[in-house]
Each structure stands twice: as C-alpha cells, then as structure tokens.
Design a protein with these regions (language model features):
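Short, well-ordered coil/turn residues at beta-beta hairpins
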Residues: 30-31, 194-197, 206, 211, ...
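A structured beta-alpha segment of the ubiquitous adenosine-cofactor-binding alpha/beta core
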Residues: 6-26
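Predominantly a Rossmann-like dinucleotide-binding segment in NAD(P)-dependent oxidoreductases
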Residues: 73-78, 83-185, 301
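C-terminal helical cap and adjacent loop that interface with cofactors, partners, or active-site loops
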Residues: 148, 214-222, 229-230, 240-361
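A short catalytic or substrate-binding loop motif that flags glycine-/basic-rich loops and adjacent residues
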Residues: 141, 184-189, 197-198, 212-213
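Glycine-rich phosphate/pyrophosphate-binding beta-alpha loops
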Residues: 189, 205-215, 289-290
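N-terminal Rossmann-like dinucleotide-binding module
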Residues: 1-3
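Beta-strand-loop-alpha-helix segment that lines the small-molecule cofactor/substrate pocket
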Residues: 25-26, 32-33, 37-85, 99
C-alpha cells in the first residue's frame, strides 16, 4: 500500500510522545484497563480524538474525567464496544426502531465467558489482579451497550438506579491462589445487576468469567408486541396476529408458545437487515475480527470522523456503560442497596430523540 513504516514508541512515557505529534488525528487505546483514562485524557488535551477499549474507565471519578475532558477539548471519545455491531444485534435494533416489538420494557445482557484457558495471556496477571481486589460487575459493557441502544439511553431515557447481588467466590479464589498466591478474592463467581430507567424499563446484567458456562452475552428484549433472544438460541416471538399465516397456539401445548419458525425468522432478518450490515457485511465477514463486528466498529468510527458526523458511541455512552463496575461494588458493599446512576449529560438526557446511526447525505 506504499505506507510508511510504523513509528514505534515504548517505555512508560513513550505514548505521551505519540500523543504530542501534530500529524495524528486519532489515538486508539488498547492497554490494560488502568491506563485507559490517563492516556485518553492526555490525548484529548493534545487535540486528538480518542478510541478507547472497554471498559473506558474504572471509577466514577475516571468517568467524569472523560466527560469533562471531551467537553472541554471538544474531542470525540468513543469506547470501542464492538458487540453493538454484531449482526443479530444490528438487525434486532433495526426491527425495534421500526416498531416490531412495540414498546420495549425489559432488556438483558451479560458477559458470561469462562476465561480459564486465557488468564495466562494477560501479561503480569493484570486482569486477574484487578478482579482480585474489585467486587462487582467489572466488565459490563458487552451486555449493557446493546441494551442501552435499544432503550435510547440518554437519547430519551436514562438509567436511574441499580441494585446488585453476587455469589461467593469459589473458582475465582481458587484461581487466584494458584496463579498469585492470593488468600482473598473480591470478585464473585456470579454477579447480577438490575437497573431501573426513568421511563420505567429494566435492564438485567450478569457477569461470570470463572465457571464452565457456555459463552453468552444474553442479548434479550421483551416488548409489548414481541420478544428477541440471541443466546443460547437466536429467535423472535410475536403476537400470533402479527405473523401472517401463524395459528394461535394451543394453550394446552406449551411447546407451541415458542419462537417463530426458522423460515419466518430468516425472512424477517433479511427484510430488516440493518443498512450498515447490508452495505458492509460481506467484507466484514471476510476481514473478520470477532466474526466481523470489529471491522464494522472501526469502519463506522472512521466513516463518522471523515464525514463530520456524531459517533455511534459518544463519551456519555462510555461513562454510562463503564460506571457500572463502581456502582455495583457500592451496592454490594451495602447489602444490595439501590445506588443512583449519575446523569453524565447533566440534564440533557432527553434532548436527542432516540438512538440512530448517523449517515452522510
């Protein structure tokens, strides 16, 4: 491609030199979690837009640092939440925006992923070390991001408060003893969070990276007119009269109260395939990156920057989705007491009418 060789930067302070360059527009941060905010803030203060891996921030104070710096510098700060770009999520979001599910009342999301084969890949045990000292849902964004887009969070609704519960730590503690010699482990084997929104909807989150449960981000929505579910089985359900040719189920046969047939599902997904997926799906699947969603995420980031459009994920998304770790910890430490979710928009949560992907005219 006749591109110049990449310029290497190393050492504890090398990244600052990169941020100070005047020929860079965007700084892309993929480091251990604790470095996300210092690097993002420094980059924005030096005139750079920022794309930062998940979670973007690890404390409430860090969430506010990102918001305040982005507002002060007028730089974009996008958290790299890739799961909002998976194909089922994009299509289901498009269906929701066309009203197929009626009013969405409840959503579910999770990060259930047995990391037992992967812990050694985290240099210096940085991820396990963080979990060892932090209780709560420390990795909520993969499940929460798609849920928030469905519910138009800070675009017509907002998260008001949450409560969290967790199990004791068994596998996590055993793992930490083996790898770090730790005698205590704060992060539970299973953590659950319930969130209530201003408009009376709910979100359920789960976190579990220690037990042999099959991988799941749950991704589920319950609406007044329909239902969608991704894990463990993709499917949709609607009122019988919404689907042409469907008979009313026999109430004595519970197996008939089920998903629409596969042929109807396939036709529905093709009809409501998201315009972004329709445009770029083939190339995204060919290039790959978690099945193509990483490619779509980067494509959308560059597309919006090049066309001067609002990013799909703004700094308020980054703060809202990342603050769950701190808030669930506070709830758990006070016997699952409700904890308020900050309004990072400072009152502007209903100024935008619904979530939409910005497109150039």
């Amino acid at each position: 491609h006749n591109l110049p060789a990449a310029a290497p930067y190393s050492g504890e302070e090398g990244w600052k030199e990169l941020c100070r360059r005047d020929d860079i527009d965007l700084v892309y941060i993929c480091t251990p979690w604790q470095l996300h905010v210092p690097m993002a803030v420094y980059a924005m203060e030096h005139g750079k837009h920022v794309a930062v891996e998940v979670p973007a921030a690890m404390s409430l104070d860090e969430c506010w640092q990102l918001v305040d710096t982005a507002e002060k510098t007028q730089r974009h700060c996008m958290m790299l939440e890739n799961c909002v770009y998976d194909f089922f999520e994009l299509t289901t979001l498009n269906m929701a925006q066309h009203g197929l599910f009626g009013e969405i009342l409840h959503t579910e999301g999770s990060y259930i992923h047995n990391l037992e084969p992967y812990w050694d890949y985290y240099q210096g045990n940085w991820r396990l070390d963080f979990n060892q000292s932090h209780r709560g849902d420390v990795y909520a964004t993969h499940g929460l991001g798609p849920a928030c887009q469905l519910l138009d969070i800070h675009r017509g609704d907002k998260m008001n408060y949450l409560v969290a519960m967790d199990t004791k730590s068994v596998n996590g503690l055993k793992l930490a003893k083996e790898k770090m010699g730790a005698e205590t482990f704060a992060n539970a084997d299973q953590t659950l969070t319930l969130i209530k929104t201003e408009r009376g909807r709910t979100i359920l989150l789960e976190h579990n990276v220690y037990t042999p449960r099959p991988y799941s981000r749950m991704y589920q929505l319950t609406g007044t007119e329909g239902f969608a579910n991704k894990y463990p089985v993709e499917g949709y359900a609607f009122r019988p009269e919404q689907i042409a040719g469907e008979e009313i189920p026999d109430h004595e046969n519970l197996s008939e109260h089920s998903f629409i047939p596969q042929a109807a599902k396939a036709a529905l997904m093709e009809r409501y395939k998201h315009p972004i997926a329709r445009d770029i799906e083939e190339k995204a699947r060919r290039v790959g990156g978690h099945g193509g969603m990483d490619f779509i995420m980067d494509y959308r980031l560059v597309y919006c920057l090049q066309h001067g459009l609002p990013l799909d994920q703004d700094v308020y998304d980054a703060a809202e989705w990342s603050c769950i770790g701190s808030l669930t910890s506070a709830s758990l430490e006070h016997n699952s007491m409700p904890v308020a979710v900050p309004d990072f928009t400072r009152g502007d949560w209903d100024k935008v009418d619904g979530f939409r992907h910005a497109m150039a005219q």
